[in-house]
Structures are given as C-alpha cells and as structure tokens.
Amino acid sequence: MMKFRFRRQGADPQREKLKQELFTFHKTVEHGFPNQPSALAFDPELRIMAIGTRSGAVKIYGAPGVEFTGLHRDAATVTQMHFLPGQGRLLTLLDDSSLHLWEIIQRNGCAHLEEGLSFHPPSRPSFGNASFPAGLTRVTVVLLAAGDTVVLGTESGSIFFLDVATLALLEGQTLSPDEVLRSVPDDYRCGKALGPVESLQGHLQDPSKILIGYSRGLLVIWSQATQSVEHVFLGNQQLESLCWGRGGSNIISSHSDGSYAIWSTDTGSPPTLQPTVVTTPYGPFPCKAINKILWRSCESGDHFIIFSGGMPRASYGDRHCVSVLRAETLVTLDFTSRVIDFFTVHSTQPEDGFDNPQALAVLLEEELVVLDLQTPGWPAVPAPYLAPLHSSAITCSAHVANVPSKLWARIVSAGERQSPQPASSALSWPITGGRNLAQEPSQRGLLLTGHEDGTVRFWDASGVALRPLYKLSTAGLFQTDCEHADSLAQAVEDDWPPFRKVGCFDPYSDDPRLGIQKVALCKYTAQMVVAGTAGQVLVLELSDVPGEHTVSVASVDLLQDREGFTWKGHERLSPHTGPLPWPAGFQPRVLIQCLPPAAVTAVALHAEWSLVAFGTSHGFGLFDYQRKSPVLARCTLHPNDSLAMEGPLSRVKSLKKSLRQSFRRIRKSRVSGKKRATTASSKLQEANAQLAEQTCPHDVEMTPVQRRIEPRSADDSLSGVVRCLYFADTFLRDATHHGPTMWAGTNSGSVFAYALEVPAATAGGEKRPEQAVEAVLGKEVQLMHRAPVVAIAVLDGRGRPLPEPYEASRDLAQAPDMQGGHAVLIASEEQFKVFTLPKVSAKTKFKLTAHEGCRVRKVALATFASVMSEDYAETCLACLTNLGDVHVFSVPGLRPQVHYSCIRKEDISGIASCVFTRHGQGFYLISPSEFERFSLSARNITEPLCSLDISWPQNATQPRLQESPKLSQANGTRDIILAPESCEGSPSSAHSKRADTMEPPEAALSPVSIDSAASGDTMLDTTGDVTVEYVKDFLG
C-alpha cells in the first residue's frame, strides 16, 4: 500500500507538449545603468558605445533597442576598451593585463556579441616563457594603430606590437626605453628611468606616427614606417594624458599638478625644451591632477579644451568635475559621482579640416550624461536608456500591464512638461548605431519604482530600452528640515569655480521617513496610492493642468487606544497647511496618516468603490477617499508584540530579555507535553502522528518532498504585520448573494475577511452616492502552521481570477462567473491552499517542501499564452522562493508545471525586489542600478533583436572561443536549470534559442487534493500534517 502511494505517476505526453508551448525560461535583458562601470569606448563610424564594468561585463549600446551583452570568463575589471572603427569589433584590456577581442556577428538574421581571441602575457616572463620578452609584464595602455596593429605600453616602459588578426606578438618591433633614451640629451637622463608608459595616441592624418608619453614627462613621436624617433619633447612634470591637435601640428598634455601644456610639432628636429603654452586653469593654489584632456577644433576658431580633474586641492578636491573651456567661456560640470571617462561625438573624416564637436558624453560611476555642445548653454540631452534607476535608492517596485493608450499619452505629456524648457537641447540622441528588428510591442507596460527620497518614477517597460516617462515627488507635501539648509548652501556658493550641477544621481535623502514602501495604480481612472515609511498613505489623481488646492488630511489610529503599547519610533511627517501649487501630473487629494507612524507594509486600491486599504506592523485600515472618512481600523498586535512598537531603528533585543524568553520557551515545551488540552483537534493530530509512526515501515524510500510543517508560536515577534490586502466581489455571507469584500493576511497566518456595504453607483455614473461605507467582519481564518500569508486571490466559478476594477464593466475583460461556487486562494510562506466560498472549507492544497528552509517570497497570477495557438492561454500561479527558484502552478488545481532556478539564493536583495507581470515576465534587481528582466512565457518575451551594417574584412573570420549569451550575467545566475524532465527541447518559438536542463517537478513538489476520492488516507501519511485551519464565521 505504501509503495503504491509514494509511486510517481507517469507524465502525460500531450500535457508535456502543451507545457513546451506555454512555458520556457529566458533571462532576456538588463535594464538600467551598468553597475560599477570602469571603461568606455565609442565607434564614430558605427555610432555605437561600449561600457565595461569591474565584474568583467561588456555592454554595447546603439539606437534604442540595440544592445549587446558579453561577459569575460574571468571576473576581472575591464580597464580599457577600443573599437576597431567600422568593423563591429572591440578590444578590451583587463586588470590582469589580458587582451580580448570581441566581435558582433550576424546569425539567424540578428547580431550577437562573441569573444573571438585573447592574449595573456605571462606573469613572470623569465621563468619558462622564452617566447615572451622580459619587459612584457603589466600592460598600462593600449592603442589600435593603422587599423591592423595593437600597440601595448607597459609598466617597464617598453612598447610591444601585436597583430590584430591573431593577437600575436610581432617579432623585431619592440621599442625599449633604452632605444628612446638614445634620442634624449644626456643632461635630461640624469640616470633616471622614463617610468611607465602613460599614454599612446595615434596621428589622425598619418597612422604610422605614434605619440608616446612616459610617466616622468617625456613625449616622443615614433614613426612605425622608419622605425625611428622623429621628435622629442622634454617635459619635466609628471604626465597624466595626451591628445593630438586636429592637423597634427600641436600636442596637448595634462599633468599631475593640475596644469596642461601645448607643444608645437613644427619646431624641427632638435628636442623641444619648452611648451608654447602652460596653464593651470584653477591655480595658483595646489590643484589635483588633470586625468584626461581633449582638444577639439572648431571652424569658427574657438576651440574646445575639455578635461577632468584639476580642481583646487584644498577647497574643492572632493568634487567630481569635467571642465569645458572655449575661448573665454569656462564651465565646471559638477557631478555627484566619480568621473570614469568621456568622449566627444565629432567629425573624424580625414578630409574634414575641423572636429566641430556635436556632443560630449561623460561616463560617471552612477550615470551617463550627454551634453549638447552646439546649443548655447550646453544643455543635457535626454537619454532614451541607461537612466540611473537608483538616482535615489529603490525601495519598492510594481508593474502595470496593458496600460490604456489615453492614460499613456497623459503620463508622457506630464513627463515632458517636467523637463526644464530654457535649457532644452535641439540635438537628438547621438548614439544611433544599428537597427532595432523587434516588432512594436502589442501592449504598453509601466514599471513603477518607489524611492528613498519620496519619489515614484514611471518607466516605459514595453521594450528593451527602459525609458523614463515621468517622476512624481511627494516631498513637497511635507515639512522637512532640509529646506532651510538648502537655501543657506545656495547662498554660500561662490562664483568661482563656475560650477554647474549636472546629472540626476542624488544618493542622499532629505528625510528617511519620505521613503516609498508601496505603490498601487488604477489604470482606468488614473488614480494612484503611494504609501511611505512614516505611515503616510497618499491618494493621488492624474491632472493634465497645474493646479493649487489643499490636501485633505485624516488620521487613523490602528491601536484603537489599546493599553500597554508605546511607540518608540520616528514621528509622523508634518504636512504643509493651506493651498499648495501642484504641477501637471499626479496631484495628491487625500493624505491618510497611520498611528503609530510605522512603515506601510501593504496597500490595495479599488477605484470603483473609492476605497483604499492599508496595513502596517500594527494593523490595517480601510478608508473611503470619496467621503474622506475612515471605514475600519483593526489592530492585529499580539499581547507579546512589543517589538513592533520599537520602530525600524531600535530592534535590538537585550541579552537579558533574550535569555528569559528562551527559558520560557523551554519550560513551555516541557509543560505542554504533560498538560496539553484534550480538544478534538489535538486528539486528531495525535492520532494522525501515531498512526503514521505505526504504519510507516522504515525501509520505504520516501520522496524528498515531505517535511513536517511545524506550527509557529502565536507570540512570535512581529506577528501582527499585515502582509497582503485584497478587494473582491464574491460570496461571503451565503451562496446566493455576492457583494464587496476586503481580505487581509498577517504574519501570523491569520486571514480576516470583511463584508462591505458599498452604495451602488447610479446607471451610467462613475461615482457612487455620498453614503457611508460599512464593513462587517465575516470570516476569520487561522492557518494552523501560522506561516505568514503572502497573497490572497478569489477565483470565480470557472477557476479564473476576478478581473480588476472596471475591467468587466467596461468590456475590457470577460465578466466573472458569478453562478458557480467561488473559491479563495491563500498563499502562505509554506503552502498554497484553495478554500471554497462561502463556507471556507479546504478544497486543494500544495505544500512547498522542496528543501528544508524553503519559503515563498513572491506570488502572482499570470496568463501564459501558447505559441502555437492565438486563442489558447492558461492562468497560472507564479511563485519565487527564498532559494531563488521560480515555480509555476496550475490554477485552481495547484499542480506543478515548471520549476526554474532564477536567482542566486545568496542574492537576498534580488529576491526581495522581484516583481512578476500579468503576462509571465518578471524583474528583479541584480545591482542597485539594474533590473534583470526574465520571462517564464514561451510567447511573451522581450529581448534585444537587432543588427549592425558592417562591412567585414576578408580576414575577419576567426575561430570563436565562445558565445557570450545574454544569460551569462555579471551579477546574476550563470546556469539555467530545472524544468520538466520530458520537455527535452525548448519550445517551438521563434525566440527560443536555448534548451534548459530538465528535472521532474515531482521530485521537489507534491500536490494534495483534499476533495479527491483517494484523499482520505493522504491526510494520514507520514507528513504528520497539522495544517487544520481554524475558521470563525461571524455571519452565520
């Protein structure tokens, strides 16, 4: 009998084929700004840009939607990058002095980035590396000369030449420091070495000439054609960088003392002793080094000199600046993060006599800024991608699918009004290389991110490029201490240097209480709820015109004067009084302040009923924002929940208190074994456990899915935290009358269901009558294992989730089945369970017991469309665990469909930030500035599909080492595993390019159907199941 019960059932081939058409797993694209960038390159012919990172990632960007991603096999920092112009090839230098050649190749109509060749110099050339010269140790600088030669400058001062086609050393072409010193006067040598090679620059007109700069200050023009030194410049100041003038008649050098010098190359063959111009822009006091300098000529005669660094060391040495000098105009661009590199977009054709720069692109540690150099004032150019998601730290996120076109246009219009008009740029985005082959998205998707500074940002998440649309700020509603400090700081600011704040990255929050914790948006009424750290809940409405009005303020006491609790956390925010001006966009109408002012942990918005529900660690409330009056307040604190009153900044238990509670638990466990109450439920649990122990033979091989779910103590810390809130029109009173309900789930496994009396709207009217809403407690369910309730959803008579407010009434979704019996799906951290309504009796359950310690973290209902049939789709439950695994279950049967490894289990922040979409996709943070996008749907995939117009040279075809797929992320999981065993190939989708390693889901998951005929003895199996729910019916 036992062998029969634990035997796995065979897979249905038809169902497995259908799974292939519905589900597949892809990590598709990384949205946002690369984490910890370290190198920058630009191809002026193809108009593409590359960014390298400290984790070894390579990212190439062109026009919006044109993206390529690669990852070096060794997690080393990319220190330099150089494009082979017009070839779609990129040379990277890592901090281990290895060189790597990447190529963009065409395959199946789309372009891909692959690593072709690599060059690894020996770490100790004198030992067993006779083929390598002794001076080839640490590479300090790389130059691509004459299109087919790689020039390497080293720490020893030697210069080596490699063939681009093979990355092999060219024999007999090494330039040693001794050979250079022979061209230098004796009095300059002074017995000192030249130092490392600091800079290598190729001549724009004559590719055979190379400008070499050594650390000590010596500059040399080397001719590859004659293999000789053509000119020597005897600099004495430590060198930082070099740049040729357009025609090659001048050289500009920058130095460690904050100065730059201009040298003339037309002085003949003798060594040049002095530069023609030496300037310290921010002198005369000691200045920091000018790290990089560019000289760009203009047809008008006023040339550009652009450099980073050089600030006065004592007063502004901590500033991150790039200075732009043209004629008598000097602007000091002041950034909030470190400058990595910069380049100009200018004319590079040899026949053009001038550079005529169009734009300046500055790569910073936390953002990319592009300035228009052709418009007076040099304004910033709005970026269509690479926006810094973390301009203020992300605290929450949400996704809104199928946004109506009218609402989309209104949000875009509000965002366009936010950009400063006087400094608007006439220049379009200058990085326009490649062609986006992806089709226009069939629906618009919004990604909403809440931030630490009290802002909510709206992003266009419809395609590959995550485009900023609109920013909502809530800080203006409240009085903060920073307002006076800001005005003083602006008054003290000097006129010199001429600083200009550039960029939007601002890591500092004015007040930590402003942080956004939860966001909800009704896409049909353009109403929104934003909840924050200090218990503030804002109800906002989209307005197309600016306005001035007073925001209604209401307080809701969640403790309800309960004695014995004293709040020790932060104070609530003080709102401004009186009418306030509001720009076009989302404008606040009502402010609800929870008491105590703890962080809001859950919100729900029902615009059709004009209700908003909110929860904290103390309880939950219901507010009627049409009448601007509270409807309900319920405290969920347990008498021992003192930790909830201490606030987020004082949650450290004393050792004395911890020891006392430990001894109490030991004493309680001993006593409970002797004096356990002999109730009917406890007798049933004891009988189940005894029967399981007696009937289970020890030699039976059990599936590794079964684990006893231990009931948690009712007095666990923070058991009153409200985890989820939900509105539904369903059957709660009886099986014949349905009506509005509100559901709340807590950390202690409690579920509260309220029947609401909401006045019905008149025929054709949008708003309901001005009558009070009433709430009556209908059911109270206590999960016996007391696991936190993560999500609640009501299913209609067909087993489908109820539509969103206004979806059915506006014929935007199929009306729910209100004839058959409804059911409620309750997802806790340990199991999923479906209960019938209105009796709340268990129908189906699924215990998530794949591994010890496995817990549910995120849950969402999603629609998965078939790739073979336009009309077939299934609604399933997507689940992310604390181990980083994603599971998909059927609804309402709760049968496992697929199981993938998505996020590393050590990546706690990534798991906590995950957001599922309604169409089987998801987002999670792989760094503070990047979202990883993934897809569980075989049909709904958003990934880069692009191409480059490249004329390949004949010898460009080289053996490939490896393709760098989009799945090999610098910050994510490298391996994609776990899916049904019978699905041996990837689905027959045009987007499916990879076959995943499969594994039978039964090895990790086990469904139980309580209503089935064979379920009688399943409840008495070896799990020792104690999950008998306790249900109170207050309406019976």
Curated annotation (Swiss-Prot):
Keyword check for Cytoplasm: yes
Phosphothreonine carried by residues: 957
PROSITE patterns for the chain: WD_REPEATS_1, WD_REPEATS_2
Keywords: Cell projection, Cytoplasm, Cytoskeleton, Endosome, Exocytosis, Golgi apparatus, Membrane, Phosphoprotein, Repeat, WD repeat
Molecular function (Gene Ontology), one example: myosin II binding
UniProt feature coiled coil, ranges: none
Xref: SMART domains: WD40 (SM00320)
GO term, biological process aspect, one: establishment of spindle orientation
GO cellular component terms attached to this protein's record: axon; basolateral plasma membrane; cortical actin cytoskeleton; cytoplasm; cytoskeleton; early endosome membrane; Golgi cis cisterna; Golgi membrane
Record PTM Phosphoserine, positions in chain: 662, 964, 982, 989
Job of this protein: Cortical cytoskeleton protein found in a complex involved in maintaining cell polarity and epithelial integrity. Involved in the regulation of mitotic spindle orientation, proliferation, differentiation and tissue organization of neuroepithelial cells. Involved in axonogenesis through RAB10 activation thereby regulating vesicular membrane trafficking toward the axonal plasma membrane.
Family of the protein in this entry: Belongs to the WD repeat L(2)GL family.
Additional free-text comment from the UniProt record: Complements a salt-sensitive yeast mutant (SOP-deleted mutant) and thus can regulate cation homeostasis.
Subunit structure, interactors included: Associated with nonmuscle myosin II heavy chain. Interacts with PRKCI/aPKC, PARD6B/Par-6 and PARD6A. Interacts with STX4A. Interacts with DCAF1. Interacts with RAB10 (GDP-bound form); the interaction is direct and promotes RAB10 association with membranes and activation through competition with the Rab inhibitor GDI1.
The protein's name in its UniProt record: Lethal(2) giant larvae protein homolog 1
Species, as recorded: Rattus norvegicus (Rat)
